[in-house]
From Swiss-Prot:
Region (Linker 2): 219-242
Species this chain originates from: Homo sapiens
Record annotation: effect of changing residue 523 to R: In CMD1A; uncertain significance
Record-given protein name: Prelamin-A/C
Effect on the protein upon substituting residue 631 to D: Found in a patient with metabolic syndrome; likely pathogenic
Effect of residue 22 to A: Impaired disassembly of the nuclear envelope during mitosis. Decreased accumulation to the double-strand break (DSB) sites
N-acetylmethionine sites (modified residues): 1
């Protein structure tokens, strides 16, 4: 389409080509064309000015209305969030106070634990000394028992010898009695022989008297007869009679002397024999008495030693019983104190874990509030930048705390680059945490809820009758599977408990089917615990799913944002004494956009700096970590905690706020 100046130039060119013009005419025509062109430009400018004024009036009206709406919304939101921030600050103050109190209690409990440990060490030292003393006493007792057994064996030997000696003494006493009896018989025979000798002497005297009487009578008769005989033969008869008498007397005297000698010889021989037998018996009896006396002396000494050893043994046994009783009392006291302290430590750990969970929930709430406040701040800053309004003091302070990367992309009246969203990709990853305190461990948990696999890691069979598997998915109802009463898991064997919906075959003892449940359940936080028959948790495995939302853009600023995200994420893990919490993704439930990242402050959390509005990538990870207060021993804060990350979305300002957004 030709303009008026072009049409005029065409006409003038045609006229000039038809008729030649003078220079003055040409000059005037050019001036006329210039004036017409200026008039056309002025008319166009006036029309443009009028349209711009009309548009400006409409825009001013819209700005006024928008300012009124924004002022009303900002005032309401400011009041609401100031109240919420006040409550959050109070909650954080109370949590900080509670944490300080718990730290003081923890330090106190640790001091008590150290004291109890020192006392326990001392008691163990005393116990070791008592055990050493007990061993010495047992060795002494064994030596005394050996000496006692030796003394008893000697006593038995001496008793045997005493019994033999008593038998010999009895025999000797019997022989002595026999010898005494023989001596008495010999004495009786001697007396009898003496009596007989006396009788024979008396008889001999009597016979002598009789013979003398007879001799006198014979003499008298012979004398009488000799009177009658003649005197010649009287001498002959007298001599014959004297010879006969002398011969008879000599014979009688020889017989008596011979009988006396024989009797004396027999008596002296028997008396010598009896005396020798008595001497031998007296010697044997003396020796037996001496041996018996020595045996009695030895028996008395051994009995005294035995009684002394028995007294020492009784004293040692009494002392040993006292030591065992005191040792048992000390063990019971130590065991009771240790049980009480362990129970107190378990209660303290449970309270600490409960306080830590509450503190974690409060920090989650705080981080969500910080993200919402940051999102509102981004919206307000975007509107202020679009409308070229003066920033509020809060925005200035917020920009003053921003990182250098955000300052470079937002400062100096730079123009925000337009971005075009091409595609959105979500990635899910699982993190696992397992704990085992017995022989059986939870080896594998299916992400889709098809099965749970257990393994016996020991070298012994494990009876699992009436054991339970408890499955918890977030706030969903608890699922409980109970093993058969006679089920036993062999050493090194694996058992898989299938859900009914998995289509597996029931094949004990390696494959069990839970017919009452179609699935074990699936979700973002799956906790599987193995409970024994006494109700104690012996194994646990927790499966946490993290969803990462990644948006691909046309702009080349995505690499810068990813680089910034990587640097901030890596810098947060430099301290080896930090414990990271488990990963989460915060997404808007209505608009589908990830929540913006907040610059969380405080003693408990560490997050990355703010992201510039000109960045194109919307996948941002905010990692919160806790610094360990105590040592690395059991019962510290970081034992049962895992990483927690917040995956945030696009931080660029929106041109229009979404309606009914749960985050906004």
């Amino acid at each position: 389409m030709e303009t008026p100046s072009q049409r005029r130039a065409t006409r003038s060119g045609a006229q000039a080509s038809s008729t030649p013009l003078s220079p003055t005419r040409i000059t005037r025509l050019q001036e006329k064309e210039d004036l017409q062109e200026l008039n056309d430009r002025l008319a166009v400018y006036i029309d443009r000015v009028r349209s711009l004024e009309t548009e400006n009036a409409g825009l001013r009206l819209r700005i006024t209305e928008s300012e009124e709406v924004v002022s009303r919304e900002v005032s309401g939101i400011k009041a609401a969030y100031e109240a919420e921030l006040g409550d959050a600050r109070k909650t954080l103050d109370s949590v900080a106070k509670e944490r300080a109190r718990l730290q003081l209690e923890l330090s106190k409990v640790r001091e008590e634990f150290k004291e109890l440990k020192a006392r326990n060490t001392k008691k163990e030292g005393d116990l070791i000394a008592a055990q050493a003393r007990l061993k010495d006493l047992e060795a002494l007792l064994n030596s005394k028992e050996a000496a006692l057994s030796t003394a008893l064996s000697e006593k038995r030997t001496l008793e045997g010898e005493l019994h033999d000696l008593r038998g010999q003494v009895a025999k000797l006493e019997a022989a002595l009695g026999e010898a005494k009896k023989q001596l008495q018989d010999e004495m009786l025979r001697r007396v009898d022989a003496e009596n007989r000798l006396q009788t024979m002497k008396e008889e001999l005297d009597f016979q002598k008297n009789i013979y003398s009487e007879e001799l006198r009578e014979t003499k008298r008769r012979h004398e009488t007869r000799l009177v009658e005989i003649d005197n010649g033969k009287q001498r002959e008869f007298e001599s014959r009679l004297a010879d006969a008498l002398q011969e008879l007397r000599a014979q009688h005297e020889d017989q008596v002397e011979q009988y006396k000698k024989e009797l004396e010889k027999t008596y002296s021989a028997k008396l010598d024999n009896a005396r020798q037998s008595a001497e031998r018996n007296s010697n044997l009896v003396g020796a037996a008495h001496e041996e018996l006396q020595q045996s009695r002396i030895r028996i008395d000494s051994l009995s005294a030693q035995l009684s002394q050893l028995q007294k020492q043994l009784a004293a040692k046994e009494a002392k040993l019983r006292d030591l065992e009783d005191s040792l048992a009392r000390e063990r019971d006291t130590s065991r009771r104190l240790l049980a009480e302290k362990e129970r107190e430590m378990a209660e303290m750990r449970a309270r600490m874990q409960q306080q830590l969970d509450e503190y974690q929930e409060l920090l989650d709430i705080k981080l969500a509030l910080d993200m919402e406040i940051h999102a509102y701040r981004k919206l307000l800053e975007g509107e202020e930048e679009r409308l070229r309004l003066s920033p509020s003091p809060t925005s200035q302070r917020s920009r003053g705390r921003a990182s250098s990367h955000s300052s470079q992309t937002q400062g100096g009246g730079s123009v925000t680059k337009k971005r075009k969203l091409e595609s959105t990709e979500s990635r899910s990853s699982f993190s696992q945490h397992a704990r085992t305190s017995g022989r059986v461990a939870v080896e594998e948990v299916d992400e889709e809820g098809k099965f749970v696999r257990l393994r016996n890691k020991s070298n012994e069979d494990q009876s699992m009758g009436n054991w339970q598997i408890k499955r918890q998915n977030g706030d969903d109802p608890l699922l409980t599977y109970r093993f058969p009463p006679k089920f036993t898991l062999k050493a090194g064997q694996v058992v898989t408990i299938w859900a009914a919906g998995a289509g597996a075959t029931h094949s004990p003892p390696t494959d069990l089917v839970w017919k009452a449940q179609n699935t074990w359940g699936c979700g973002n936080s799956l906790r599987t615990a193995l409970i024994n028959s006494t109700g104690e948790e012996v194994a646990m495995r927790k499966l946490v799913r993290s969803v990462t939302v990644v948006e691909d853009d046309e702009d080349e600023d995505g690499d810068d944002l990813l680089h910034h995200h990587h640097g901030s994420h890596c810098s947060s893990s430099g301290d080896p004494a930090e414990y990271n919490l488990r990963s989460r993704t915060v997404l808007c439930g209505t608009c589908g956009q990830p929540a913006d990242k907040a610059s969380a402050s405080g003693s408990g959390a560490q997050v990355g700096g703010p992201i510039s509005s000109g960045s194109s990538a919307s996948s941002v990870t905010v990692t919160r970590s806790y610094r360990s207060v105590g040592g690395s021993g059991g019962g510290s804060f970081g034992d049962n905690l895992v990483t927690r990350s917040y995956l945030l979305g696009n931080s660029s300002p929106r041109t229009q706020s979404p309606q009914n957004c749960s985050i906004m």
